Amino acid sequence: HTASWYIDQKRQFESLALKLGFNSVPEQKKALAQIIKDFVSNGGFLFAMCSATDSYDIALSTLGIDAAHAVYDGTPIDSNLKNKINYDNSLAFENFDIITDPMIYEYANIDFPPSNNVVVRGAEADYFSLFEFSAKYDPVPTMLTQNHVGVIKGFMGQTTGFNREKIKKHILIMGEDETTP
């Protein structure tokens, strides 16, 4: 965390958070996550990629709790973080553990494979399959999965697969990587 680009970006984020009336960048990001949740709760659609898919839920489940390492906000992580996480606030995931070590390239145990322990697969093994949906009964997932192919190749990256045990029961799954637990 000593690279000049990192220090510059950190200063920019802190300046913007203060300008918008927040005491810290984590507070600002949690407020934005709540705005996004409200948008979705009111019928809006959300398409998220990469770390956005799980970082929303981490932010929402830790509203009012210091879950950010001191390197990010200058204050210590709440010592009772694990017991204070409120999964009822999250959109799609539950019962996950948050990874707070800033030296580990991972946020939680939601995604599979974990970003800090990537399983490198060749081009033929790097794919996921979309499920079929009825346009009559399921118009939204039908629209979102219309790619004219049933298998999407070469799409794996940070947070593109999820541990099924961490997905809330009401979440509609539109595709799968059969190697995911």
Model-derived regions, located:
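Short alpha-beta junction capping motif
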Residues: 1-55
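Short, surface-exposed, charge-dense and proline/glycine-enriched linear segments
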Residues: 2-14, 77-85, 100-107
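Catalytic beta-strand/loop cores that center a nucleophilic Ser/Cys/Thr
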Residues: 30, 54, 84-181
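Carbohydrate-binding surfaces of carbohydrate-active enzymes
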Residues: 37, 53, 57, 74-78, ...
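Short, surface-exposed basic-aromatic patches at helix termini and helix-loop junctions that form
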Residues: 38-41, 60-66
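Short, solvent-exposed loop/turn and secondary-structure capping segments
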Residues: 49-52, 58-61, 70-71
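General N-terminal targeting signals
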Residues: 63-64, 73, 110, 115
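Rossmann-like dinucleotide-binding core of oxidoreductases
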Residues: 64-76, 83, 88
